[in-house]
């Protein structure tokens, strides 16, 4: 006697098979991660891979649909990490790490504050000396603007900045006077600080002696003790060249 299966059973079986096949196609358990790219400032890539549990030849199904969870796991592993972002594109995984950065220190009413990468200030006893001291700032928004650009700089450049002083004059109401750890002095402008300070390493490398790097209008340098007229002439020449 031939058994006749109910229509509902066939429909349920078809749905189950469809879901199973769909899951297999989505997870592709036979696929593996081919490459892992880690973007971080100072934390070694090997550490980040270990925190994430992702390496070349890791099964793709361990990553697919779990990138947010993996990112949270990375942050919990290391106090130096501010945020993490994990992106999967086929067999390639990219992990972007934003490390916690001490953007500097500022003193107000004899109280010291540490400034984080978001410009938030927190009371401390005394600066640790691992980031620049901000002085002369009266507008908190100006501090945040400078901080937002400072934290984007290369680590070696950040480590070379000792002090960032708000030092306006009649020619530049937003002038910054920056003291470098290598012995040079930099003049810059709040609005263009982040973009122009990146030129500093190349300019400093060509200076025959310690001196001033002026990034307010163009970019030029002169040695300490050089007549200010020479510096002014160079600045004027630079402006004229830019207008050509």
From Swiss-Prot:
GO biological process, one term: FtsZ-dependent cytokinesis
One GO cellular component term: cell division site
Subcellular location per the Swiss-Prot or TrEMBL entry: Cell membrane
InterPro entries: Cell_div_FtsQ/DivIB_C, DivIB, FtsQ_DivIB, POTRA
Pfam family, one: FtsQ_DivIB_C
Membrane-related topology note: Single-pass type II membrane protein
Membrane side Extracellular: residue ranges: 28-244
Free-text function comment from the UniProt entry: Cell division protein that may be involved in stabilizing or promoting the assembly of the division complex.
Family that this chain belongs to: Belongs to the FtsQ/DivIB family. DivIB subfamily.
Protein name: Cell division protein DivIB
Source organism of this protein record: Leuconostoc kimchii (strain IMSNU 11154 / KCTC 2386 / IH25)
């Amino acid at each position: 006697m031939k058994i006749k299966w109910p229509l509902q059973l066939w429909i349920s079986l078809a749905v189950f098979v469809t879901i199973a096949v769909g899951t297999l196609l989505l997870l592709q358990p036979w696929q593996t991660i081919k490459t892992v790219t880690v973007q971080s400032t100072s934390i070694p890539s090997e550490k980040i891979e270990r925190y994430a549990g992702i390496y070349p030849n890791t099964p793709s199904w361990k990553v697919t649909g779990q990138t947010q969870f993996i990112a949270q796991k990375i942050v919990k592993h290391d106090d130096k990490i501010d945020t993490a972002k994990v992106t999967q594109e086929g067999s390639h995984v990219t992990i972007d790490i934003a490390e916690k950065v001490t953007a500097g220190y500022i003193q107000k009413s004899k109280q010291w504050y540490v400034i984080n990468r978001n410009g938030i200030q927190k009371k401390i006893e005394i600066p640790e000396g691992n980031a620049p001291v901000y002085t002369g700032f009266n507008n908190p928004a100006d501090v945040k603007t400078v901080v937002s650009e400072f934290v984007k700089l290369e680590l070696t450049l950040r480590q070379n900045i000792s002090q960032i002083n708000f030092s306006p004059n009649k020619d530049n109401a937003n002038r910054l006077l920056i003291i470098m750890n290598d012995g040079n002095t930099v003049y810059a402008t709040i609005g263009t600080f982040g973009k122009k300070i990146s030129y500093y390493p190349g300019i400093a490398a060509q200076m025959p002696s310690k001196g001033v790097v002026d990034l307010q209008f163009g970019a030029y340098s002169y040695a300490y003790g050089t007549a200010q007229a020479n510096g002014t002439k160079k600045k004027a020449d630079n402006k004229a060249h830019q207008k050509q």
